[in-house]
Amino acid sequence: MSQSYINVIGAGLAGSEAAYQIAERGIPVKLYEMRGVKSTPQHKTDNFAELVCSNSLRGDALTNAVGLLKEEMRRLGSVILESAEATRVPAGGALAVDRDGFSQMVTEKVVNHPLIEVVRDEITELPTDVITVVATGPLTSDALAEKIHALNNGDGFYFYDAAAPIIDVNTIDMSKVYLKSRYDKGEAAYLNAPMTKQEFMDFHEALVNAEEAPLNSFEKEKYFEGCMPIEVMAKRGIKTMLYGPMKPVGLEYPDDYTGPRDGEFKTPYAVVQLRQDNAAGSLYNIVGFQTHLKWGEQKRVFQMIPGLENAEFVRYGVMHRNSYMDSPNLLEQTYRSKKQPNLFFAGQMTGVEGYVESAASGLVAGINAARLFKEESEVIFPETTAIGSLAHYITHADSKHFQPMNVNFGIIKELEGERIRDKKARYEKIAERALADLEEFLTV
């Protein structure tokens, strides 16, 4: 394949990472991004790597699978992780970022790279004669989605996910909330709105009866568990919320708390957490409260949360449809297409779920596209690593039941020998092995 550059289509997390990895290997890149010419319903800016759901990149500890994945990516020179570290905001044991600052930094690093040419245009055909990384994301334009659909054996895979509302911090009644991270992990980074049992029951009742925005009648409601609307959780039952986003464990009342409580209990019946959304600390999002309620209903129901009675919503929650491919049948473990060998795919459309996972897939696809360009053999990362196990999972899962997957220790190759019973100790060992295997892999 004679060519002088590689195409990357889409400048989200995966596309930005792929383009950067290719350029860092000395190969010119044409990076196509349609925003600026054509917008999507969910994106608010024309910046690259815009975060449309939460501003959290989740746990940072190596005993957390996504924490391990991030450490592997750091060692591989990820531009997404570098930008995230530079724009992080307080979030306890998690890595959360200033939403706008993060995407602005990624944009600047990519746009200013001497080997990356940014083309603001919509691509409607899949190239056949140029090595191309397709990373158009779950919000792929209709024209290109049709071409991918044809590659996808005509099967339409999709699910819905949603974003949580964002609130002006100056409109939160601080006398009714308290600052704390769960189990006092890291710095006190979350505002916590405690509820008594009666307050929770009233809130739950209002939530399950609130009016949702309509879906297209021909589409079934299929949600990804990690980004499920709060009203859908509520309809599954009270325990789903109390063991999920409103879990009170580790969020005891502070000693100076004077608000309502159930008797002498030290822990609230339920807690709503709010997380800082920007570096200035002027915006907070309601953690785990992705929603598809009508905007008026969001205001009515969420203002029942203690401290949010007069809250001003800077952005209401929204829901969008995400599409993904039949990766077990269509992709190699290198993220290369089995059907059209000049193509690589990356990001959520491949069935990896989550910001970090999307960027990781872009990193691997970019490395392998660069290797193909140089006529070198592509690389498959070890299944003992988080980055390798994710690629293995999406390309080896049962196609009939394939659904998007977050990175987790369950998909990473088991440790040899007798199973370590203590979960933390087991995860530490898995992480230790992963980083050692990655180091060895990179030196071969």
Swiss-Prot record:
TM segment ranges: none
Keyword check for Flavoprotein: yes
Cofactor: FAD
Binding positions (FAD): 10-15
GO cellular component: cytosol
Subcellular location as annotated: Cytoplasm
SUPFAM superfamilies: FAD/NAD(P)-binding domain
One Pfam family of this chain: GIDA
Cited InterPro entries: FAD/NAD-bd_sf (IPR036188), MnmG-rel (IPR002218), MnmG-rel_CS (IPR020595), MnmG_N (IPR040131), TrmFO (IPR004417)
Source organism, top-level taxon: Bacteria
Catalytic class of the enzyme: transferase
GO process terms (BP): tRNA methylation; tRNA wobble uridine modification
Catalysed reaction equations from the record: uridine(54) in tRNA + (6R)-5,10-methylene-5,6,7,8-tetrahydrofolate + NADH + H(+) = 5-methyluridine(54) in tRNA + (6S)-5,6,7,8-tetrahydrofolate + NAD(+); uridine(54) in tRNA + (6R)-5,10-methylene-5,6,7,8-tetrahydrofolate + NADPH + H(+) = 5-methyluridine(54) in tRNA + (6S)-5,6,7,8-tetrahydrofolate + NADP(+)
Molecular function terms, GO-annotated: flavin adenine dinucleotide binding; tRNA (uracil(54)-C5)-methyltransferase activity, 5,10-methylenetetrahydrofolate-dependent
EC number: 2.1.1.74
Keywords in alphabetical order: Cytoplasm, FAD, Flavoprotein, Methyltransferase, NAD, NADP, Transferase, tRNA processing
Family: Belongs to the MnmG family. TrmFO subfamily.
Role played: Catalyzes the folate-dependent formation of 5-methyl-uridine at position 54 (M-5-U54) in all tRNAs.
Protein name (record): Methylenetetrahydrofolate--tRNA-(uracil-5-)-methyltransferase TrmFO
Organism: Streptococcus pneumoniae (strain ATCC 700669 / Spain 23F-1)
